[in-house]
UniProtKB/Swiss-Prot annotation:
Short name of any one Pfam family annotated for the protein: Pkinase
Domain Protein kinase: 21-335
Active site positions: D151 (proton acceptor)
Keyword Repressor: no
Main EC class the enzyme belongs to: transferase
The protein's name in its UniProt record: Cyclin-dependent kinase 19
Bias (Low complexity) ranges: 371-392, 467-495
Residues given in the record as ATP binding sites: V27, G28, R29, G30, T31, Y32, G33, H34, V35, K52
Ranges annotated as biased composition (Gly residues): 408-421
Catalysed reactions listed for this entry: L-seryl-[protein] + ATP = O-phospho-L-seryl-[protein] + ADP + H(+); L-threonyl-[protein] + ATP = O-phospho-L-threonyl-[protein] + ADP + H(+)
Amino acid sequence: MDYDFKAKLAAERERVEDLFEYEGCKVGRGTYGHVYKARRKDGKDEKEYALKQIEGTGISMSACREIALLRELKHPNVIALQKVFLSHSDRKVWLLFDYAEHDLWHIIKFHRASKANKKPMQLPRSMVKSLLYQILDGIHYLHANWVLHRDLKPANILVMGEGPERGRVKIADMGFARLFNSPLKPLADLDPVVVTFWYRAPELLLGARHYTKAIDIWAIGCIFAELLTSEPIFHCRQEDIKTSNPFHHDQLDRIFSVMGFPADKDWEDIRKMPEYPTLQKDFRRTTYANSSLIKYMEKHKVKPDSKVFLLLQKLLTMDPTKRITSEQALQDPYFQEDPLPTLDVFAGCQIPYPKREFLNEDEPEEKGDKNQPQQQNPHQQPAAPAQQTAAPPQAPPPQQSSAQTNGTAGGATAGGGGAGAGLQHSQDPGLNQVPPNKKPRIGPSGANSGGPVMPSDYQHSSSRLNYQSSVQGSSQSQSTLGYSSSQQSTQYHSSHQTHRY
């Protein structure tokens, strides 16, 4: 071995501590890493970055999978991995992301706190529409490229703060993401428990063997309902959960209490679910005879004949084969009536949400959100805390929470052809359709709020990712700022949550 050459390479290798200023700027902490708010020391740009240090030495298989995916995925609504640093001296791994100041978990918490303080301030409906549109746009891109996210929840949906991408949604935490083209084995054989419980589709709870893109759509429906009501639609107590068993009685009970028990005609294949015998044994259809999504949403002043409710109903369809797709949802009439969705979800208004607080290096890990079990994700990305939102009057400041970090999840590495080819961005037909005589403010082609549509901004790809993934069984974990996964407390009105990147 040429030790002189090796020493020369080590001297020339870029080191995180030489390039970025991040001391005292920790914004997240978790089981699998720390997240720092960072700036370049050389002043080449004034951008803020999220710098995630993965705990331990070396790089895990799950980290390899997330890094491989993130290096390939390029879309305005998917968090951008800027660079990976490998420290050969201490074998640390650092991931550099764009910094997002907010996430939906903190935004929703802000509005929930206003209700608790007797000064209710709902999320503006125009903001809800813009958030949902951009989430669907990002997921449509992932699905078009044969990627399932599999862990969508408010903490994994970041929103950019002040800057060039102000108010832009970023889907984060790809630690559980999976390529689903020609899997070698049924996905359920590899990691049977996927997606945080409150956002888990009923087919997963019933042990579906070959689940599909529909699991992400159900989770988006849950997020949509939470944006409309400021409460998790399917929250339930989640104690003593056996994560190796997909069936969870309390979670199914909560879903049926809101939606009603599915009729045979509404979900014909429910009898084929592996856990259907358990369902028959533990549940009685008559218990939920008076339950329906219509009644639940009417309590929150959402009319059953409104376009917002009709889209929610399509997203939360029990039968996954009848559930709407992301492409269909993007063309739903809900997005074609005023106010049209905007690229800046804050619509140019002042952002009332507080910025993320810095954590002390010796500050103990936050105790909140321990009661919401989820799959372990040994590697994840930091999400941004909630900060400022749209124009509504300033609500009383909620309890401030600090971001936590977690690792990445699951296990698959990039193999085969590697990530070099990149994604081909071809415009999907039909997604630029808007109502007659209406000028779109945002679309799959994206544009500045109120400005002309620029097709290059929001292009979708139907090409597959140019590499294969070998999958290991995924273990459960917490996550980092929207750049990873985190847990929510059953006391959802007062708990803190970690963020993801």
